[in-house]
Amino acid sequence: MKKLKVVTIVGTRPEIIRLSRTIAKLDKYCDHTLVHTGQNYDYELNQIFFDDLDIRSPDVFLECAGKSAADTMAQVIAKSDDMFAEVAPDALLILGDTNSALSAVSAKRRKIPIFHMEAGNRCFDMRVPEEINRKIVDHISDINMPYTDIAREYLLNEGLKPEFIIKTGSPMDEVLSYYSDKIKASDVVSRLDLKQREYFVVSVHREENVDSDSNIHKYVKVLNMLSEKYQLPIIVSTHPRTRKKIDALNFQFSPL
């Protein structure tokens, strides 16, 4: 029996993590091609997650790192179109709302069925680049797969037909379950000289938060206040964008 030919496209850390177990299942049951857009491919942002999660290397790298966001988006659409012409998949699977999801535009033009995981998320702020992407992708996908009832309602309110919306829940349940032993065996807490449940973990990397001097100053002020109030250390997981801004503005953090 001929296997369904599926292309999965990723481009960022969250997509790699959330799809890690889905990729394994597609490899097992489908004729599966894993594609990386290359929009920010480096060790810190991507390869470390392929290594840590034991995910196989992508079959195709599109190398879509453009000089601007518009350039990257244009390359994702154009280069994915070339890839679709060569691979001729029966279906495209994408997750989320980053620029890699815009490969759905070229898939739609080629009449390739599109399955969109994490559909229906909304922040109702069109200044956010991902809000634009998710609305485009939701409305051209053949099957939308929201995680929650709320996300499903947003899709219905925008006129999408209920028979093409399937609430799936988050794939992170399977991811956390599969890697639970590895997570428990990690020595990161002891290496950082922390006590279980006696610290905060924070990640700040969104463009609208980090690129604004005013906004990031407010975040640092709040983090320092929290640390002082609760007398607990705060671990800031720094995206390269955030690290660059912190260094440029020479922020001072609470010694805790």
What do the predicted segments below correspond to?
Residues 5, 31-33, 113, 164, ...:
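Residues at the starts of beta-strands that form the adenosine-phosphate
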Residues 7-10, 16-22, 49, 61-159:
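Active-site and donor-binding regions of nucleotide-sugar-utilizing enzymes
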